[in-house]
From Swiss-Prot:
Membership in a protein family: Belongs to the influenza viruses hemagglutinin family.
Name of the gene encoding the protein in the UniProt record: HA
The name this protein goes by in its record: Hemagglutinin
GO molecular function: host cell surface receptor binding
InterPro entries, sorted: Capsid_hemagglutn (IPR008980), Hemagglutn_HA1_a/b_dom_sf (IPR013828), Hemagglutn_influenz_A (IPR000149), Hemagglutn_influenz_A/B (IPR001364)
Glycan-bearing residues: 27-28, 40, 104, 144, 172, 177, 286, 304, 498
UniProt keyword Cytoplasm, yes or no: no
Assembly description: Homotrimer of disulfide-linked HA1-HA2. Interacts with human CACNA1C.
Pfam families found in the cross-reference section: Hemagglutinin
Summary of the function given for this chain in its UniProt record: Binds to sialic acid-containing receptors on the cell surface, bringing about the attachment of the virus particle to the cell. This attachment induces virion internalization either through clathrin-dependent endocytosis or through clathrin- and caveolin-independent pathway. Plays a major role in the determination of host range restriction and virulence. Class I viral fusion protein. Responsible for penetration of the virus into the cell cytoplasm by mediating the fusion of the membrane of the endocytosed virus particle with the endosomal membrane.
Segment forming the signal sequence: 1-17
Extracellular-side positions: 18-529
């Protein structure tokens, strides 16, 4: 019995066996990603694919300053509103910036025909040559060119008029019929603008043009219109009951434009030879101009980013990330970040069998922790880590390259009568935007799922690599760990890690230790059986003695009567 108890004590005493464990890296990162199956998975490393910041400024685009219209609108600038005089010297720009509520547009009230189409045309223009299409001093000798001014277009407190148009009036009591032509010899498209005056009453018509009935005719290869003034009293706008309607056309190289009129013509003075440039555009923004450079400009501000997506603004100019409605697009590159909880021990499970990562292993993603008589330590498996890094890096770069198509996305122009078309266009744009957003989010979710599964697989492979080497020279003790049946010094540990473990060398020692341990288990089972029998017999005897004592006491005091019948 003493011998058996000694064996039991030996079995219950702790033994310091050499161990090696497979694990993975963990750190203090708080990055979270989403996958197809999970949300907010904490990971060790990730990359952001979504730009959500801007500088709040208008910047030079690729070193070229924008044309900032300030208080002027496109109409005021291109017609030559005298309050926009500072803009007339601008010949080139990277893009045009207009404020939402421009004060200086058409100073003389009236309708600007096809204004939205003109804006669309100008959005692709990066420079122009402003030139006199009909020189003021010699083109109209039979008409007055100085009295055509108005208080509604005042400048510095004096009546004035557009700087790119001439209001022709009667001279010496007459307004002779006029015919003027221009041949486009600029080898570029030429933008020509003019107007037709509609007086508020017949008296003004006679006073200004010396006739009641007048017409204006404009003809080119692609344009042919005849205008008749509409004389009618109208509500005052900017102090005027009359109106001027504004028109424009693009004259192709070599084409001729002919103006004929016997009154009411607001004649072209300056025209524009257009140079179109890829990447130009018009944005509506309240942002201020700053001394900065960018490759991507939005109405909110400049974006300087190489990321494939942005959620700053759908309207962009330059080389810009694609706009999506997402609030988060983060792609995982590392592993699930689950640092080991000390109370559970060092290890715990990725891939279902290691519960936590190691913050102590900093030189790789996957690796080993060993413990023997010489000490303990971490070591990364450099080969599997490097292969994983290369594979994931190539995948991330491929995703960014495929999705990082640079865009210029400008708003489309519609007039008030095209509201239904504008609404339809918005629905179409919203549909495309939803598709882009869905595709981007789904791509990231799928790739995140694949990356985390890839890491799990790598840890499993490393575990199986060790298991296949050790065979029955060690036993699996859970949590990714093996306990050797033999002594394994640092040299032995290193051979396991690099795949050169000599199984036969340690087989005999392992076999003997396995047999000893199995013997201890058998002896332990015998001891446990003896203890169990002893415990059962002792308990029964105590129960019988207790029952007899109670019965004797109850018989002695009369509580229990005992009769023996023969």
């Amino acid at each position: 019995m003493k011998a058996k108890l000694l064996v039991l004590l030996c079995a219950l005493s702790a033994t310091d066996a050499d161990t090696i464990c497979i694990g993975y890296h963990a750190n203090n990162s708080t990055d979270t990603v989403d996958t197809v199956l999970e949300k907010n998975v904490t990971v060790t490393h990730s990359v952001n694919l979504l730009e959500d910041s801007h500088n709040g400024k208008l910047c030079r685009l690729k070193g070229i300053a924008p044309l900032q219209l300030g208080k002027c609108s496109i109409a005021g600038w291109i017609l030559g509103n005298p309050e926009c005089e500072s803009l007339f010297s601008k010949k080139s720009w990277s893009y045009i910036a207009e404020t939402p509520n421009s004060e200086n547009g058409t100073c003389y009230p009236g309708y600007f025909a096809d204004y939205e189409e003109l804006r669309e045309q100008l959005s692709s223009v990066s420079s122009f040559e402003r030139f006199e299409i009909f020189p003021k001093e010699r083109s109209w000798p039979k008409h007055n060119i100085t009295r055509g001014v108005t208080a509604s277009c005042s400048h510095k407190g004096k009546s004035s008029f557009y700087r790119n148009l001439l209001w022709l009036t009667e001279k010496n009591g007459s307004y002779p019929n006029l015919s003027k032509s221009y041949v486009n010899n600029k080898e570029k498209e030429v933008l020509v603008l003019w107007g037709v005056h509609h007086p508020s009453n017949i008296e003004d018509q006679k006073t200004i043009y010396r006739k009641e009935n007048a017409y204006v005719s404009v003809v080119s290869s692609n344009y042919n219109r005849r205008f008749t003034p509409e004389i009618a009293k109208r509500p005052k706008v900017r102090g005027q009951e009359g109106r001027i309607n504004y028109y424009w056309t693009l004259l192709e190289p070599g084409d001729t434009i002919i103006f004929e009129a016997n009154g009411n013509l607001i004649a072209p003075w300056y025209a524009f030879a257009l140079s179109r440039g890829f990447g130009s555009g018009i944005i509506t923004s309240n942002a201020s101009m700053d001394e900065c450079d960018t490759k991507c400009q939005t109405p909110q501000g400049a974006i300087n980013s190489s990321l494939p997506f942005q959620n700053v603004h759908p309207v962009t100019i330059g080389e810009c990330p694609k706009y999506v409605r997402s609030t988060k697009l983060r792609m995982v590159t590392g592993l699930r970040n689950i640092p080991s909880i000390q109370s559970r021990g060092l290890f715990g499970a990725i891939a279902g069998f290691i519960e936590g990562g190691w913050t102590g292993m900093i030189d790789g993603w996957y690796g080993y922790h060993h413990q023997n008589e010489q000490g303990s330590g971490y070591a990364a498996d450099q080969k599997s880590t490097q292969n994983a890094i290369n594979g994931i890096t190539n995948k991330v770069n491929s995703v960014i390259e495929k999705m990082n198509t640079q865009f210029t996305a400008v708003g489309k122009e519609f007039n008030k009568l095209e509201k239904r078309m504008e609404n339809l266009n918005k629905k179409v744009d919203d549909g495309f935007l939803d598709i882009w957003t869905y595709n981007a989010e789904l791509l990231v979710l799928l790739e995140n799922e694949r990356t985390l599964d890839f890491h799990d697989s790598n840890v499993k492979n490393l575990y199986e690599k060790v298991k296949s080497q050790l065979k029955n020279n060690a036993k699996e003790i859970g949590n990714g760990c093996f306990e050797f049946y033999h002594k394994c010094n640092n040299e032995c540990m290193e051979s396991v890690k690099n795949g050169t473990y000599d199984y036969p060398k340690y087989s005999e020692e392992s076999k003997l230790n396995r047999e000893k341990i199995d013997g201890v288990k058998l002896e332990s089972m015998g001891v446990y059986q003896i203890l169990a029998i002893y415990s059962t017999v002792a308990s029964s005897l105590v129960l019988l003695v207790s029952l007899g004592a109670i019965s004797f006491w109850m018989c002695s005091n009369g509580s229990l009567q005992c009769r023996i019948c023969i």
